[in-house]
């Protein structure tokens, strides 16, 4: 059994939607990123890679590589899963906390969980996503960006 932790941050930029957990959410800003900016899937990918001792997403999908420009983070997550399976691991469960003052996440969490479960080839009850604010403190509280903490448990396949 292995545990990994992931953390990612993206700042807001021009745009009218963000993508979190594969779900497109209308918002007054987008997220600045080389890929699609899905900070939730990036943190989950890092947690999974860390648990399997496979480095991090920067190693596997460098932002200096043009092939990952605008990349769909769901595709990247599925690639991470293949890497983990290749090392003899399977996902036990994942848990993530989105830290954002806005937009409100509650209406989208069920859809995020469903897509993540599909991409990780696990049951819905093996995926948890929750959201919190920082009570208007710090960069997320000032609505400058979004942060996500994620934890993954891997089991021998």
Curated annotation (Swiss-Prot):
Binds 1 divalent metal cation per subunit. The record marks 34, 133 as: Transition state stabilizer. One of its GO terms (molecular function) is 2-C-methyl-D-erythritol 2,4-cyclodiphosphate synthase activity. The keyword Lyase applies. The keyword Metal-binding applies. Pathway: Isoprenoid biosynthesis; isopentenyl diphosphate biosynthesis via DXP pathway; isopentenyl diphosphate from 1-deoxy-D-xylulose 5-phosphate: step 4/6. It comes from the Bacteria. 4-CDP-2-C-methyl-D-erythritol 2-phosphate binds at residues 8-10, 34-35, 56-58, 61-65, 100-106, 132-135, 139, 142. It is an enzyme of class 4 (lyase). A divalent metal cation binds at residues 8, 10, 42. Signal peptide: none annotated. Its cofactor is a divalent metal cation. Keywords: Isoprene biosynthesis, Lyase, Metal-binding. Its EC number is 4.6.1.12. Gene3D superfamilies: 2-C-methyl-D-erythritol 2,4-cyclodiphosphate synthase (3.30.1330.50). One of its GO terms (biological process) is terpenoid biosynthetic process. It catalyses: 4-CDP-2-C-methyl-D-erythritol 2-phosphate = 2-C-methyl-D-erythritol 2,4-cyclic diphosphate + CMP. Involved in the biosynthesis of isopentenyl diphosphate (IPP) and dimethylallyl diphosphate (DMAPP), two major building blocks of isoprenoid compounds. Catalyzes the conversion of 4-diphosphocytidyl-2-C-methyl-D-erythritol 2-phosphate (CDP-ME2P) to 2-C-methyl-D-erythritol 2,4-cyclodiphosphate (ME-CPP) with a corresponding release of cytidine 5-monophosphate (CMP). Homotrimer. Belongs to the IspF family. This is 2-C-methyl-D-erythritol 2,4-cyclodiphosphate synthase.
């Amino acid at each position: 059994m292995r545990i990994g932790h992931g953390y990612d941050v993206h700042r807001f930029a021009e745009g009218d939607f963000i993508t979190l957990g594969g779900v497109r959410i209308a918002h007054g800003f987008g997220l600045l990123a080389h890929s699609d900016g899905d900070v939730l899937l990036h943190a989950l990918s890092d947690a999974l890679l860390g648990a399997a001792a496979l480095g991090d997403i920067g190693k596997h999908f460098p932002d200096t590589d043009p092939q990952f420009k605008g990349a769909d983070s769901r595709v990247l997550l599925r690639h991470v899963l293949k890497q983990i399976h290749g090392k003899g691991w399977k996902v036990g469960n994942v848990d993530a906390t989105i830290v954002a003052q806005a937009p409100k996440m509650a209406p989208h969490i069920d859809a995020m969980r469903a897509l993540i479960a599909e991409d990780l080839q696990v049951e819905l009850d093996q995926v948890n996503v929750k959201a919190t604010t920082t009570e208007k403190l710090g960069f997320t509280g000032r609505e400058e960006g979004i942060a996500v903490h994620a934890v993954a448990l891997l089991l021998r396949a």
